[in-house]
């Protein structure tokens, strides 16, 4: 039976001019510590196939409590403190709840 309590987050990052390498490094630095969180089901980084690529994080957590726990970690707070200088615009974040999903 699929778990209908999980939470999926899609976060899209548009790097400021000449900041893509630093943004990528910052986002990649979040992968290992986030994946080790007990409530993290997946945490995957993608890039768009556009001339000036954006980065997209596809995150899945066991439930809302796990997402909130993620947002209180030291690595999340350190990442947020460095993020704004690397962006051309604010991060676009969508938090999704399952309606009809497999797994």
Question: Predicted regions: what is each one?
Answer:
Residues 1-7, 45-53, 81-103:
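Glycine-rich beta-strand-turn "strand-cap" elements at beta-sheet edges
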Residues 2, 14, 18-21, 52, ...:
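Residues at secondary-structure transition points
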Residues 3-45:
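N-terminal first-folded block
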Residues 7-14, 44-71, 92:
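Short, well-ordered beta-strand segments in beta-rich or mixed alpha/beta enzyme
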Residues 29-41, 60-94:
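An amphipathic, aromatic/His-enriched active-site/gating alpha helix that lines ligand/cofactor pockets
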């Amino acid at each position: 039976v699929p778990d209908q309590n999980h939470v999926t987050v899609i976060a899209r990052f548009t790097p400021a001019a000449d900041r893509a390498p630093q943004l990528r490094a910052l986002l990649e630095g979040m992968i290992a510590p986030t994946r080790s969180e007990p409530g993290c089901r997946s945490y995957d980084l993608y890039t768009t196939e556009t001339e000036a690529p954006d980065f997209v994080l596809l995150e899945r957590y066991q439930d809302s409590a796990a997402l909130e726990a993620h947002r209180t970690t030291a690595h999340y707070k350190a990442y947020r403190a460095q993020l704004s200088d690397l962006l051309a615009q604010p991060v676009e974040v969508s938090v999704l709840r399952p309606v009809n999903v497999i797994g």
